[in-house]
């Protein structure tokens, strides 16, 4: 590649890895560059790499590495760095997601609304996110391929693998639903087990204090409907050797340190300080900074409780851990026999006895198991003694085996707690495994870990290669096999039999006398020429392997010890015979073959290899998805990016390997629109007229004589370096064009300045000459004229002085004479007028003052007395009327008592022929009747007393009227006194006297007013007493009803009642009917016959079945009428809903509102709900919104509460009291008097009003949600329109303003048409404007939310051209809002504030000059800093290539956002949808106009029903009060 001056490049630098530079001078074999560190560097061309400019990347960064023009190592590194500085922690590399640990909370990225945004979205359509990868795996598993998926999360310790795994599980739980029959989600259950797994599987390493020393594969299981049905945790590759051997400054597994710090529990297990145990004191690091071992111990125990491990098992687990620690302290010395061993001393014996006690096994058997082994032969069992080294190895093998079995038991129990679905056919597995490791000293553990990563990298390479080939196939391009570096040779080196490193290591471990020197020698001898294996210079036993991520040197000192892992039958027999069920359960009995070989060799590396093979088989059976976690710095600090560390991780994570695979094929790919838009300047003649983008792309490439390209269906594919050639040629053309334009422009500016200067000089010269000539002529003319002027002036001055002197003398004389005369006359007139004015004014002032005082005093006194008198008169009249009504009721009661006596006489006659045994009951009934008569007499006497009290009140009222007459007479007398006082001569004295008199009268009047107020209070007390007496009478009547009910039951039980099939009503029923109280029986809801009807029907004989059938038939007919009104569309008359009016009329006529118990309201609500559940419910929603709101307003305005809510003894002041208060004063909500009759409502009617209110809210919410669902696809099309149409219109795409997207205006027109159709539908159904206004407002709020969130989630939407496009669409919506007026649109335009301000920010020019305050206060006052920061980080100018906001403003906003995140002030930059109901019942009553239902005619379909014939006979039914 040739380099020219001014080219942007990358140059390698030791400290930073790569730095930005610009070519200053290009020579044949050397290039001089100027770096960003302000240094001139001379390097060879091979060490330079081309760099993308900010203009090329669109904002300085891309969200997918494949979009980089120059896909190379520094380009990937610095793209991640720029995005990390903007808190954009996720970046794609094709289908691979790179996640950089932010080391700070970013809650706005992980809330439920964000999960909803990524649900069902194609990968790459929104900004990179871990939710997108999780959704891609879920969609392919459940929707597209029906194949199990896997998500491989890798990275070094501290890169955020565990947190990423949690987020993936959280999203899968969100889209897959909750686990069956469990309140906790699978994600919660798995996370609850994390503290337990971390305690037993995590340890401190060199780089991380909490490093997972095992691989975890979480398998989320789904049923056929895509819902989560179970989960399982699979663990792989536990680092067992860490139990017995660690290096400084690392630690053993956390659980050992927690147990030693557990206080009393540690004493129970005879544990001491950490440093006293061999398995722990090999490292000097015992505690972790910021972690308390004792607190972590209790957290682990709580995790065991949550998982469901019993207290007994917990105790057994910790006893087993303590036993392992005690095992490590057992030391051996040579025994009496050769090659034998024994326990060293008493200390070792103490630990042995303690371990045996904790294992609950025999101590002697434990000693023999450690110091000897048994060999089964045909002749018998041979016991062989072990030397000290073999005994120690035997001890460590036992400790590792016990710990491994314990860890497997924990995982098994956790899986039982979570719950697995064995019938599940689809799974999504999430793999969290340790990443590639390369330390200063690398041992056997790093060898195994890197071997696993080599396997995973091979799987990763195959997947990346496969994805590349799939894209080539989908684009139908001609391609050949891509050559890329395969790591199969490394895998063969490690695992191939029989001469792989693992095989050689196992062979060396099988020989007791083998050492690491013999192992290294044999390895170098077998692989002396292998390209991947190297011998180190400074050590004969160390070796170096060239892994995919770089070279790693391993020290073989402890390879053999860590690899040996014998399966000893004696170990299993020892612990399986333990008296502890838990320990014996860990070791099942061995089969016969294993017993014969009691000391079977099993290497850690071989088992590691088998587990890895099983893992790879699982992964190969699934479709993989990759998440590479990156740790930006070793200090775990936010906003710190260490280039070298990240570069090393990119290499270890295989990201750069994926880049290399892409470079081997066609790494650069562009859509035809993007390619033409960028490189059309190379062949401008092809842009004349209409053209095909694909053919134009081909023409450009052929014109440039490029051969390494392929034309796909939608993209052009270019080999590495081809895009650089095109960019160089494009840059040359643009440079030449720029120079040509600059030359012409300079010529134009220079000529323009010269012409302007010449014209100015000529004008100045002419002006100067004219000025001189005019000045000379003026001097001469002025000199000649001056002589003549002087002559005439002197004469005129003298004459004028003489005339002025004469006139002045005459004028002074006449003025003095007149002045003296006028002054004299004025003085005389003023004295006279002053006298008159003073007298008149003094008199008038006191008269007015007196009249004002007198009139005000009298008016106030009279008005107040009249008001009090009228109020008292009304109260007395009301009390009198109530007493009269009560007396009338008592008279009626007496008449009814006579009727009852007549009835009893008739019953006695009929019972004369009955059995003598019934006579006793008749006597009892007579006594009851007599007692009732006595009570009625008492009630009558009480009524008489009330009448007497009424007469007393009437007398008091007359006294009050007399006082009012006296006050009026006093008023007349005061007026006469005022007239007499006006004629008094001495106004001052008379007014003073009168004022004192008036003050005395005022005092007297106040006293009389106080007396009147006391009397009124007494009257009010008497009224309250009367009210209490009425309440007592009401209670007595209730008791009478209860007693008569008992009497009726006894009478019905008599045999003679068969002859009385039509009996009169009971006393309580007749009394209720006489005073207008509704009956409490359900069958008497619609009519209330009088007692005379029953008496008249005594001679008749009606069958019992007919009498019971009539109300049921009438009830069924009424129910059918209501169903017909609800199910049929009765339409409207004069804008009034017919169905609502008919239903209300029927309910009024049937007295449903006055019933204490009825089911008709439930039938109405149920029928409406049934209609709304049908298939055509969406189309009928506006119709029923209009009807239900009209019915609700009729109820609100015409129902009022009765005594049920006003009597304190009946109801408390709770919710019903509030409802009653609302119904008592409907004018409070209406604001005007209603001509419609008011109906006293009972509790069912009040409940019906509440149900109807809920129904209106439900219909409104359902209609709103349906509209949102319908408009969402239209909005999505509008969002995608700029992306699909960009560049399709050739030169038109470069135009400015609204015309930038002429092809997309139809999408906005579709939204406008949708709104027009909605308005027509609502108006056709006469939906009140109040509902339309609320509905349109919430719909525009939804439009604002959708457009704004899309702007913040899609980088291609956050561009200059897209801002113009959205702005044009918003102008159409503004026009629509203006057309429909504020009556229906309301504040809809205000609801679009967020998207309007965001779009306004996108399309302004010179953004770099804007300060943060200007942006916050002027441009985007409604947006939060987090939202503005998100727009600034996503924005790029795709039209003019200008830069965005200045780096200083971005840095200030980033600091504010970070501070905001720490304080948890706001969690998201996205807007939430408002699902609330934006109105209340009071709002409806105030906003909806009154409805006159009188002129609504009965539809023909209902006229044949007898129950509604009243609607044909009368226009305005008056309900019975």
Swiss-Prot record:
High expression in kernels and stems, intermediate in ears and leaves, and low in roots, silks and tassels. SUPFAM superfamilies: P-loop containing nucleoside triphosphate hydrolases. Residues 870-910, 974-1050 form a coiled coil. InterPro entries: Dilute_dom, IQ_motif_EF-hand-BS, Kinesin_motor_dom_sf, Myosin_head_motor_dom-like, Myosin_N, MyosinXI_CBD, MYSc_Myo11, P-loop_NTPase. Residues 733-755, 756-778, 781-803, 804-826, 829-851, 852-874 form the IQ domain. The keyword Repeat applies. GO terms for biological process: actin filament organization; actin filament-based movement. ATP binds at residues 155-162, 208-216. PANTHER family: MYOSIN, MYOSIN-15. Interacts (via C-terminus) with HIP (via C-terminus), but not with zeins, FL1 or intrinsic proteins of protein bodies. This is Protein OPAQUE1. The gene is O1.
């Amino acid at each position: 590649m040739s380099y020219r001056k001014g080219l942007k490049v990358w140059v390698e630098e030791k400290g930073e890895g790569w730095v930005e530079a610009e070519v200053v001078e290009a020579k044949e074999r050397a290039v001089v560059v100027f770096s960003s560190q302000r240094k001139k560097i001379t390097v060879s061309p091979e060490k330079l790499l081309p760099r993308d400019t900010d203009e090329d990347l669109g904002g300085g960064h891309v969200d997918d590495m494949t979009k980089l023009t120059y896909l190379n190592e520094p380009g990937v590194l610095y793209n991640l760095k720029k995005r990390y500085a903007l808190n954009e922690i996720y970046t794609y590399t094709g289908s691979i997601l790179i996640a950089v640990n932010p080391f700070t909370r970013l809650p706005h990225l992980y809330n439920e609304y964000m999960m909803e945004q990524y649900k069902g979205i194609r990968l790459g359509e929104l900004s990179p996110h871990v939710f997108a990868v999780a959704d891609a795996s879920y969609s392919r598993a459940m929707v597209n391929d029906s194949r199990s998926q896997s998500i491989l999360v890798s990275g070094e310790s501290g890169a955020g693998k565990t947190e990423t795994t949690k987020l993936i599980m959280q999203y899968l739980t969100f889209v897959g639903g909750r686990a069956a029959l469990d309140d906790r989600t699978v994600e919660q259950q798995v996370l609850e087990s994390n503290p337990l797994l971390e305690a037993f599987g995590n340890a401190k390493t060199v780089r991380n204090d909490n490093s997972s020393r095992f691989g975890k594969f979480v398998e989320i299981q789904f049923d056929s409907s895509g819902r989560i049905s179970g989960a399982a945790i699979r663990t792989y590759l536990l680092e067992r050797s860490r139990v017995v051997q660690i290096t400084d400054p690392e630690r053993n597994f956390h659980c050992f340190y927690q147990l030693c710090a557990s206080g009393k529990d540690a004493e129970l297990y005879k544990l001491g300080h950490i440093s006293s145990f061999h398995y722990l004191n090999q490292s000097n690091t015992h505690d972790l900074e910021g972690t308390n071992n004792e607190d972590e111990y209790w957290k682990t125990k709580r995790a065991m409780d949550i998982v469901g491990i019993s207290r007994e098992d917990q105790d057994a687990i910790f006893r087993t851990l303590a036993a392992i620690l005690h095992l490590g302290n057992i030391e051996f010395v040579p025994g009496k026999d050769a090659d034998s061993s024994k326990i060293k001393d008493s200390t070792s014996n103490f630990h042995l006895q303690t371990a045996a006690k904790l294992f609950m096994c025999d101590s002697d058997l434990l000693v023999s198991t450690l110091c000897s082994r048994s060999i089964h032969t045909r002749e018998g069992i041979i016991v062989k003694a072990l030397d000290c080294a073999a005994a120690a190895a035997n001890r460590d093998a036992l400790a590792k085996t016990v710990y491994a079995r314990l860890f497997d038991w924990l995982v098994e129990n956790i899986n039982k707690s979570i719950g697995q679905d064995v019938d599940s056919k689809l799974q999504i597995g999430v793999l969290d495994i340790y990443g590639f490791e390369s330390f200063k000293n690398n041992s056997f553990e790093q060898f195994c870990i890197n071997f696993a990563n080599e396997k995973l990298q091979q799987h990763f390479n195959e997947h990346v290669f496969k994805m590349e080939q799939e894209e080539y196939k989908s684009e139908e391009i001609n391609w050949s096999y891509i050559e890329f570096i395969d790591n199969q040779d490394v895998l063969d080196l490690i695992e191939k039999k029989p001469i792989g490193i693992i095989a050689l290591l196992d062979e060396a471990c099988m020989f007791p006398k083998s050492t690491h020197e013999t192992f290294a020698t044999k390895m170098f001898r077998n692989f002396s020429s292998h390209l991947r294996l190297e011998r180190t210079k400074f050590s004969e036993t160390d070796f170096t392997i060239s892994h995919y991520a770089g070279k790693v040197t391993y020290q073989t000192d402890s390879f053999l010890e860590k690899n040996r892992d014998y399966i000893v039958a004696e170990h299993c027999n020892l612990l399986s015979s333990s008296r502890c069920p838990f320990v014996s359960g860990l070791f099942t009995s061995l089969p016969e073959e294993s017993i014969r070989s009691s000391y079977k060799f099993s290497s850690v590396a071989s088992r590691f290899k088998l587990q890895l093979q099983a893992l790879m088989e699982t992964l190969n059976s699934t479709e993989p998805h990759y998440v590479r976690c990156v740790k930006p710095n070793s200090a775990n600090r936010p906003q710190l990016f260490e280039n070298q560390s990240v570069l090393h991780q990119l290499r270890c994570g295989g990201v750069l390997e994926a880049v290399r695979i892409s470079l081997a094929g066609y790494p650069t790919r562009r859509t035809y629109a993007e390619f033409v838009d960028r490189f059309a300047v190379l062949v401008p003649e092809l842009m004349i007229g209409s053209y095909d983008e694909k053919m134009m792309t081909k023409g450009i490439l052929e014109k440039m004589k490029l051969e390494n390209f392929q034309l796909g269906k939608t993209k052009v594919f270019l080999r590495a370096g081809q895009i650089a050639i095109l960019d160089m040629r494009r840059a040359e053309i643009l440079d030449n064009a720029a120079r040509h334009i600059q030359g012409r422009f300079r010529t134009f500016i220079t000529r323009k300045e010269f012409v302007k200067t010449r014209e100015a000089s000529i004008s100045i010269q002419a002006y100067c000459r004219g000025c001189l000539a005019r000045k000379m002529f003026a001097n001469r003319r002025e000199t000649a004229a001056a002589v003549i002027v002087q002559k005439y002036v002197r004469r005129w001055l003298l004459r004028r002085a003489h005339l002025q002197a004469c006139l002045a003398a005459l004028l002074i004389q006449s003025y003095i004479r007149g002045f003296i005369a006028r002054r004299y006359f004025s003085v005389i007139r003023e004295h006279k007028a002053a006298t008159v004015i003073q007298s008149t004014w003094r008199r008038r002032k006191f008269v007015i003052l007196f009249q004002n005082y007198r009139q005000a005093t009298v008016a106030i006194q009279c008005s107040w007395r009249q008001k009090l008198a009228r109020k008292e008169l009304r109260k007395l009249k009301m009390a009198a009327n109530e007493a009269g009504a009560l007396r009338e009721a008592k008279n009626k009661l007496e008449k009814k008592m006579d009727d009852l006596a007549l009835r009893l006489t008739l019953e006695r006659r009929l019972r004369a022929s009955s059995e003598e045994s019934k006579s006793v009951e008749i006597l009892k009934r007579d006594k009851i009747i007599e007692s009732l008569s006595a009570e009625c007499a008492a009630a009558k006497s009480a009524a008489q007393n009330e009448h007497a009290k009424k007469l007393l009140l009437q007398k008091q009222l007359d006294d009050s009227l007399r006082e009012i007459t006296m006050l009026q007479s006093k008023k007349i007398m005061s007026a006469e006194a005022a007239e007499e006082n006006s004629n008094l001569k001495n106004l001052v004295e008379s007014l003073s006297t009168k004022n004192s008199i008036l003050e005395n009268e005022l005092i007297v009047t106040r006293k009389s007013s106080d007396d009147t107020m006391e009397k009124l209070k007494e009257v009010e007390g008497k009224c309250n007493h009367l009210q209490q007496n009425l309440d007592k009478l009401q209670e007595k009547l209730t008791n009478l009803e209860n007693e008569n009910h008992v009497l009726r039951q006894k009478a019905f039980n008599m045999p003679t009642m068969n002859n009385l099939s039509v009996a009169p009503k009971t006393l309580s029923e007749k009394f209720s009917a006489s005073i207008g109280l509704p009956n409490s029986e359900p069958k008497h809801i619609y009519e209330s016959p009088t007692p005379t009807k029953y008496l008249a029907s005594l001679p008749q004989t009606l069958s019992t079945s007919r009498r019971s059938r009539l109300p049921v038939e009438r009830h069924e007919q009424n129910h059918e009428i209501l169903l017909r009104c609800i199910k049929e569309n009765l339409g409207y008359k004069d804008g009034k809903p017919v169905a609502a009016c008919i239903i209300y009329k029927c309910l009024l006529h049937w007295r449903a509102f006055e019933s204490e118990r009825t089911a008709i309201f439930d039938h109405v609500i149920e029928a409406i709900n049934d209609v709304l559940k049908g298939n055509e419910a969406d189309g009928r929603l506006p119709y029923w919104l209009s009807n239900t709101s009209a019915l609700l307003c009729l109820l609100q305005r015409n129902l009022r509460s009765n005594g049920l809510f006003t009597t304190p003894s009946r109801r408390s002041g709770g919710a019903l009291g509030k409802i009653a208060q609302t119904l008592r004063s409907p004018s409070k909500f209406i604001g005007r008097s209603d001509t419609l009759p008011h109906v006293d409502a009972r509790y069912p009617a009040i409940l019906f009003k509440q149900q109807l209110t809920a129904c209106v809210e439900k219909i409104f919410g359902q209609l709103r949600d349906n509209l949102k669902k319908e408009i969402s696809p239209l909005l999505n099309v509008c969002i995608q329109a700029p992306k699909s149409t960009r560049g399709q219109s050739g030169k038109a795409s470069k135009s400015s303003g609204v015309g930038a997207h002429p092809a997309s205006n139809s999408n906005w027109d579709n939204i406008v048409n949708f709104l027009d159709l909605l308005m027509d539908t609502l108006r056709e159904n006469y939906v009140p404007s109040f509902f339309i206004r609320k509905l349109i407002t919430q719909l525009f709020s939804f439009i604002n939310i959708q457009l704004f969130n899309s702007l913040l989630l899609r980088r291609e939407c956050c561009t200059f051209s897209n801002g113009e496009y959205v702005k044009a669409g918003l102008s159409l919506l503004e026009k629509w809002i203006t057309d429909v007026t504020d009556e229906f649109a309301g504040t809809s335009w205000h609801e679009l504030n967020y998207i309007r301000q965001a779009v306004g920010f996108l399309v302004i020019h010179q953004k770099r000059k804007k300060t943060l305050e200007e942006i916050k206060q002027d441009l985007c006052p409604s947006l939060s800093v987090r939202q503005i920061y998100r727009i600034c980080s996503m924005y790029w100018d795709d039209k003019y290539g200008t830069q965005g906001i200045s780096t200083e403003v971005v840095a200030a906003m980033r600091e504010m956002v970070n501070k905001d995140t720490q304080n948890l002030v706001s969690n998201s930059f996205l807007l939430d949808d408002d699902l609330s109901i934006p109105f209340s019942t009071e709002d409806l009553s105030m906003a909806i106009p009154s409805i006159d239902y009188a002129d609504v005619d009965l539809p023909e379909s209902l006229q044949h029903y007898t129950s509604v014939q009243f609607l044909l006979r009368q226009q305005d039914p008056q309900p019975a009060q």
